[in-house]
Amino acid sequence: MSHRLLFVGPPGAGKGTQAERLAANHGLLHLSTGDLLRAEVKAGSELGKEAEAVMNRGELVSDALVLAIVRSRLQSHSGGWLLDGFPRNLAQAEALDALLSELNQPLQSVLLMELDDDELVQRLLARGRADDNEEVIRHRLSVYREQTAPLINHYEQRGQLKRVVSTGTIEAVAEQITAALA
């Protein structure tokens, strides 16, 4: 499998878990913007401090920063890859389209992982991250839904969107993903 994929969905829908699994099973480069940003925060870099303040408010880190990280990883990689957590809005999707065109690595499919808000809140609280409390989580979900609706429509109109309901076991969701990408 030399897919070039996006994993899209609300925080807590299982994107990271499923992306790691798919990447490991098929030799894909897994780029999780959340993990990359948390690594910057942990390192205490200037970008990390800026990202931490934004994330603690339940807001999103700037497009320019995320796109720069993605560019640096993809330009040195010629195989299959999957992006998890980016793009989150139409402007980011258009910037990513331009980058992928420049790198001659066209996107193949977009996997939308869906789950209801109450289950998402419970999953996120169970993770125990410092930036995860119910108020911040519900705000993040609201921001996510507002910003990603046009993104989802964009990929749906291009015929690239595949939907997966991420309830059930990790294995059951993985089977749905495999079927959706077949």
From Swiss-Prot:
Belongs to the adenylate kinase family. PROSITE patterns: ADENYLATE_KINASE. It catalyses: AMP + ATP = 2 ADP. It is an enzyme of class 2 (transferase). Keywords: ATP-binding, Cytoplasm, Kinase, Nucleotide biosynthesis, Nucleotide-binding, Transferase. Pathway: Purine metabolism; AMP biosynthesis via salvage pathway; AMP from ADP: step 1/1. Its EC number is 2.7.4.3. Consists of three domains, a large central CORE domain and two small peripheral domains, NMPbind and LID, which undergo movements during catalysis. The LID domain closes over the site of phosphoryl transfer upon ATP binding. Assembling and dissambling the active center during each catalytic cycle provides an effective means to prevent ATP hydrolysis. InterPro entries: Adenylat/UMP-CMP_kin, Adenylat_kinase_CS, P-loop_NTPase. Gene3D superfamilies: P-loop containing nucleotide triphosphate hydrolases. ATP binds at residues 12-17, 127, 168. The gene is adk. One of its GO terms (biological process) is AMP salvage. This is Adenylate kinase.
